[in-house]
Amino acid sequence: MQFVSLNNITLHYQQISGPEDAPAIVFINSLATDFRIWRDVIVQLAGKFPMLTYDKRGHGLSDIGQSPYQIDDHVNDLVALMDRLEISNAVICGLSVGGLIAMRLSKVRPDLVSSLVLCDTAPKIGTEPMWEERMEIARHDGMAGLLKANMERWFTRNFHTHHTAELDGYSNMFLRVPLEGYLGTAAAIRDTDLREDAAKIDLPVMCVVGEEDGSTPPELVLEMANMIPGADFKLIKGAGHIPCVEQPHVLADTLTGFILSQK
């Protein structure tokens, strides 16, 4: 395992080597998950690209830090990590809140970003009352109070029916997220609105969404794609909010095709 201390916290990360002439891909996970969600995509891409993934603060094996957070707390952690590892001009692939981090990163440190893959995300995710309600449930009932609704939004009906062991595993991942990490990041999502920034993105962008995403539905992601000049849009069938889990081969192929199209 790989760890680094920066910005007064310790981050858990994984750096995977690849061809020197290929762009690095940086993966940013969603709320209440850790970087293991990218495992099957990384397996498909191993040997083709250098890759970096990490547990953002308050998640996985990384420190919680001072909660609540602002989106720039997460962005600054990624900036420091990429600078420490001397990674720049990378393809930034962010899922859900990871997409917010990716979009913001492209504005504050454009030298770190060559292109964006925005998975199951939007420049504005949800409403303040929605996030306040979820945060109150978490404060009162812990992560268990949010589990059922989140699993229904995250995964397809087929996954619930035919992948019960995997569903149990991802439920365990969700339940073990530190409460302060969840609350801190939920507050950051609540307070973030990047719609004006999205309309000014001047990079190659691929917007991806699972057909059965119950958190950031396809129409919301398509709206984002239409907002970003020149952005591509990909609907992944047989996937919910986390296509890297349900359709890793499709997402890996989508990433590869998008990156090769930029040469």
Predicted regions and their residues:
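Conserved HGGG/HGGXW glycine-rich cap/lid loop of the alpha/beta-hydrolase fold
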Residues: 9-64
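Active-site loop/oxyanion-hole signature of alpha/beta-hydrolase fold enzymes
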Residues: 39-46, 52-93, 253
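Flexible "cap/lid" loop of the alpha/beta hydrolase fold
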Residues: 100-108, 112-147
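Conserved alpha/beta-hydrolase catalytic His-Asp/Glu region
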Residues: 126-129, 140-200
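Short beta-strand/loop motif that positions the catalytic acidic residue
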Residues: 201, 207-209
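Short alpha-helix in the alpha/beta-hydrolase fold that links the catalytic acid
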Residues: 203, 217-226
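Acidic catalytic loop of the alpha/beta-hydrolase fold
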Residues: 211-216
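Catalytic active-site module of serine/aspartate enzymes centered on a nucleophile-bearing elbow/loop
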Residues: 231-263
